């Protein structure tokens, strides 16, 4: 009974946090009612900083943090649970986000080292917006240290990251840049992690570069018992302490 009671309270806490969120369609409105129309009419991406209709994405400066950006599709994709992300014709949004990291350096006024950058997408239960968006921002000092300490323990198969991150369990998988270019992390998660294909919306996903120039994919799964909303954004620090 105690376990059932705790589970109920945990679920209710997550529900309350979700209900407190602001309009979940703000980003979708910005893309389809502002950025795209302004670009099509005036060749001006504002309020986005980049609009690429042919490539299928836009980039927007987020209001949170001095250097955080969001990459979003120009089609209606709600989030990580969308089957469209598994379609071969869908752009490789994670790799496009990695290429868009240069906007951080331009805003900062000098080159930002790749080890300081991270890309994340939250689960359907760990996000506040219902339009697909990848957070391009700094990695937290704690997450960077944890990944550095486990560099040699991360291999090309999904396996638990020793110690997890932010008190939550994570799976980690090493990929080369060539693999990241050729295959979407969403497809790798869906096809390679047991039963992930059944509950893609329960996962948060992140991409971070390692000191050996490989990349690590990080996946965390929604778990109400540990109050894990699978918000992979938790490994980021939008104030960018890693740069100071």
UniProtKB/Swiss-Prot annotation:
<comment type="pathway">
    <text>Phospholipid metabolism; CDP-diacylglycerol degradation; phosphatidate from CDP-diacylglycerol: step 1/1.</text>
</comment>
<dbReference type="InterPro" id="IPR015993">
    <property type="entry name" value="CDP-diacylglyc_Pase_proteobac"/>
</dbReference>
<keyword id="KW-0443">Lipid metabolism</keyword>
<dbReference type="GO" id="GO:0008715">
    <property type="term" value="F:CDP-diacylglycerol diphosphatase activity"/>
</dbReference>
<dbReference type="GO" id="GO:0008654">
    <property type="term" value="P:phospholipid biosynthetic process"/>
</dbReference>
<keyword id="KW-0472">Membrane</keyword>
<keyword id="KW-1133">Transmembrane helix</keyword>
<keyword id="KW-0378">Hydrolase</keyword>
<feature type="transmembrane region" description="Helical">
    <location>
        <begin position="7"/>
        <end position="23"/>
    </location>
</feature>
<dbReference type="GO" id="GO:0046342">
    <property type="term" value="P:CDP-diacylglycerol catabolic process"/>
</dbReference>
<dbReference type="Pfam" id="PF02611">
    <property type="entry name" value="CDH"/>
</dbReference>
<keyword id="KW-0444">Lipid biosynthesis</keyword>
<keyword id="KW-0594">Phospholipid biosynthesis</keyword>
<protein>
    <recommendedName>
        <fullName>CDP-diacylglycerol pyrophosphatase</fullName>
        <ecNumber>3.6.1.26</ecNumber>
    </recommendedName>
</protein>
<dbReference type="GO" id="GO:0005886">
    <property type="term" value="C:plasma membrane"/>
</dbReference>
<keyword id="KW-0997">Cell inner membrane</keyword>
<keyword id="KW-1208">Phospholipid metabolism</keyword>
<keyword id="KW-1003">Cell membrane</keyword>
<comment type="similarity">
    <text>Belongs to the Cdh family.</text>
</comment>
<dbReference type="InterPro" id="IPR036265">
    <property type="entry name" value="HIT-like_sf"/>
</dbReference>
<dbReference type="InterPro" id="IPR003763">
    <property type="entry name" value="CDP-diacylglyc_Pase"/>
</dbReference>
<keyword id="KW-0812">Transmembrane</keyword>
């Amino acid at each position: 009974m105690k376990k059932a009671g705790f589970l109920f309270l945990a679920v209710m806490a997550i529900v309350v946090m979700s209900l407190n969120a602001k309009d979940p369609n703000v980003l979708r409105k910005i893309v389809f009612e502002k950025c795209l129309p302004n670009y099509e009419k005036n060749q001006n991406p504002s309020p986005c900083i980049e609009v690429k209709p042919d490539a299928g994405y836009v980039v927007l400066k987020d209001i949170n943090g001095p250097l955080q950006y969001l990459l979003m599709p120009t089609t209606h994709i709600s989030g990580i649970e969308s089957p469209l992300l598994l379609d071969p014709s869908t752009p490789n949004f994670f790799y496009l986000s990695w290429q868009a990291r240069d906007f951080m350096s331009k805003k900062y006024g000098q080159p930002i080292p790749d080890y300081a950058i991270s890309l994340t997408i939250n689960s359907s239960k760990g996000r506040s917006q219902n339009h697909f968006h990848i957070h391009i921002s700094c990695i937290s000092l704690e997450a960077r240290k944890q990944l550095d300490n486990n560099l040699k323990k991360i291999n090309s198969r999904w396996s638990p990251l020793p110690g997890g991150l932010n008190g939550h369990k994570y799976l980690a998988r090493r990929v080369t840049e060539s693999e990241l270019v050729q295959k979407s992390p969403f497809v790798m998660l869906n096809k390679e992690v047991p039963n992930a294909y059944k509950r893609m919306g329960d996962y948060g996903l992140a991409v971070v570069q390692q000191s050996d120039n490989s990349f690590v994919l990080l996946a965390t799964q929604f778990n109400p018992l540990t109050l894990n909303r699978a918000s992979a954004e938790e490994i980021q620090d939008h104030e960018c302490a890693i740069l100071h």
